[in-house]
């Protein structure tokens, strides 16, 4: 899948749109097919001034989309649900695994 990542802090040019492994929903997660993202102030601040915690850090805090898989412990969501979600990173990708409680 494709995702927006960065390896060093800096201007918008440090962002790259690259292939990364598909995420997998853990037991408490939902896997979302991302259809819309937001660009938050934190995205801008982090990209400009914070080195990523590991290479190819997927940016983004918030997105909307459709649930395509649910973890074994998830009862509050089902495949096909349209959701919005907020978490600490990873929303600027084609798919995003996020705790169900954050949707």
Residues covered by each model-derived region:
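Glycine/small-residue-rich loop that forms an oxyanion/phosphate-binding "nest" at active or ligand-binding sites
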Residues: 84, 102-103
């Amino acid at each position: 899948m494709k995702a927006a990542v960065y390896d060093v802090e800096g201007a918008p040019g440090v962002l790259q749109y690259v292939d990364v492994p598909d995420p997998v929903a853990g037991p408490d997660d939902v896997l979302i097919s991302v259809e819309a993202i937001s660009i938050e102030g934190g995205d801008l601040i982090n990209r400009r001034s914070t080195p990523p915690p590991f290479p190819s850090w997927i940016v983004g805090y918030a997105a909307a989309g459709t649930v395509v898989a649910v973890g074994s412990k998830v009862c509050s969501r089902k495949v096909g649900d349209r959701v919005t979600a907020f978490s600490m990173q990873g929303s600027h990708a084609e798919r995003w695994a996020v705790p169900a409680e954050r949707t």
